[in-house]
Amino acid sequence: MTPTLVFDIETVPDVAGYRALENVPAEVSDEEVAEMAFHHRRAQTGSDFMPLHLQRVVAISCVLRAGDSWKVWSVGSLEDGEAQLIQRFYDGIEKFTPTIVSWNGGGFDLPVLHYRGLIHGVTASRYWDLGEGDYADSREFKWNNYISRYHTRHTDLMDLLAMYQPRASAPLDALAKLCGFPGKLGMDGSAVWGAYCAGKLGEIRDYCETDVVNTYLVYLKFQKMRGKLNPEAYTREVALVRDTLTAMSEAHWREYLAAWPA
């Protein structure tokens, strides 16, 4: 069975990058630089959402279903820098050649990882294989790779369920809850910068982990819908997630399970 890797990232404004591009003096604080960037962006677009190349990755969380095991974790440690996080993510793809699954990964997560990985000089040979690589199965990647929108090595659930129409897309939180799963708890993407400024990187990683579990559970329901899991197999897979989380002691999993009806 091909391993499945579900992933999600959390980002903050790349203050250092914006400072360098706009020649902001060193004496201006990071918080002030961020406010300048937000103001500039609002004037341009009406939103303070930063362009993807100026989104600095502070957390990458994953669910890996491989063999008999299921695990959820955040890549690296609290002390790891952006380059280390991104390299570790691509190293996981190098190791497992998994099917990767995301929610809006094609529209946000992967382009951010492309830009930021390029800036930091990371290596991602397996990920970028389009059929001309040196791997034994590289020829297969000409027809099914991680990059092409309509291939299956990367399943962007949001994009696929919306039939590749941005106006038809649904929010993960709402869809997860409608499917009977907990959805978001206590934080969303708009709160990440404030939490980061308050030194709450651990809480950001916890939030990212719950989001990636929501994505995985919705993916299981999708696999049942498309006939890849029969009802019994679907029930077993959902039970594996619940049982694994029940055995974990962290507070965010206790909160998550409390919001998940039996």
PLM region descriptions:
Residues V12, A43, L201, A247-E250, ...:
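Generic detection of intrinsically disordered/low-complexity segments and helix-coil linkers/edges
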Residues E22, E31-G46, C208, F222, ...:
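Charged, low-complexity, helix-prone segments enriched in Lys/Glu/Asp/Gln
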Residues M1-G92:
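Conserved RNase H-like, two-metal-ion catalytic cores of nucleic-acid enzymes
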Residues T2-P3, Q55-V58, C62-E79, D91-D206, ...:
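Metal-dependent phosphoesterase core characteristic of DEDDh/y 3'-5' exonuclease domains
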